[in-house]
Regions:
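Asp-box/BNR beta-propeller blade signature and adjacent active/binding-site loops
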Residues: 1-259
Length: 259
């Protein structure tokens, strides 16, 4: 559907013919008028593995997770006739064993590049415990080809008190500020502390369109499925599913995610 009054009313767009089975894992509309979609394809059934209780630390149970396996890639499609016909790209997996978009929107920058935040597992050891990392993949030709990738948050090898690579970085959104800076918000879970994980958000800042990142020191506890929206005054509103696992929450930052 299309709206010409700020989303108050909508009209169906006739003649759209999405490729494949019609589902999209990401969708965007470029300033040129080109439409983009990202579609995830699973090349094997997802094996969830299992977890083993390893004992107590400070009165809390600890766990080892292993046996998970998957194989997924992303295909990007673009359309220049408002969705009537589509052209696909070569499948993208980059450095990952499996990869998926971490949000459903693209980022278009002033230099003409387009980026999509993604996450996945890099090594077999990472994949076994679902110790995922995330980053951005770019296109420099209007979405025709993809493959220029940079990590944002990367899981680390097991430490002395870990049973698998830690932590798990999964759901991530990136807000592009008016000054060109990017602020990334990523879900962060310590797998050792439970088979589902304890969610928090780590924040990182990039001043070079996502090439390199530094942590801001900002963090939110007990959140997941976060989305960042840039407000008219330049602040960031971060919406998320709160610790209740049902209630929505929102936090606002005026200092690029530092607080």
């Amino acid at each position: 559907s299309r709206s010409s009054d700020g989303g108050r009313t909508w009209k169906p767009i006739e003649g759209i013919n999405f490729p494949g089975d019609g589902h999209q894992d990401g969708m965007g509309f470029l300033n040129s008028g080109r439409w983009l979609i990202a579609v995830v394809t699973s090349n094997q059934p997802w094996s969830h593995g299992g977890h083993t209780e390893m004992g107590l630390v400070g009165g809390y149970r600890t766990f080892k997770r292993e046996g998970q396996a998957a194989d997924r890639h992303i295909t990007f499609w673009h359309s220049d006739d408002q969705g009537k016909t589509w052209t696909d790209s070569k499948p993208f997996k980059g450095p990952f064993k499996w990869v998926s978009p971490s949000v459903s929107h693209f980022i278009e920058s002033d230099d003409g590049s387009i980026a999509l935040p993604v996450f996945g597992c890099v090594t077999d050891e990472d994949m076994g415990s679902y110790s995922s990392s995330n980053g951005v993949v770019r296109s420099h030709d209007g979405g025709k080809t993809w493959g220029d990738f940079s990590f944002v948050f990367r899981t680390q090898p097991p430490g002395p008190d870990d049973y698998q690579p830690e932590p798990r970085y999964s759901e991530m959104d990136i807000a592009q500020l008016p000054n060109g800076h990017w602020v990334a918000f990523s879900r962060n879970e310590r797998i050792t502390m439970g088979p589902v994980g304890w969610g928090s958000t780590d924040v990182a800042l990039s001043t070079n369109l996502g090439r390199t990142w530094r942590r801001t020191g900002g963090s939110l506890q007990g959140v997941s499925q976060q989305k960042g929206v840039v407000l008219p005054d330049g602040a960031i509103a971060l919406t998320f599913r709160s610790h209740s696992w049902a209630g929505p929450g929102v936090a606002i930052s005026y200092d690029e995610g530092r607080s």
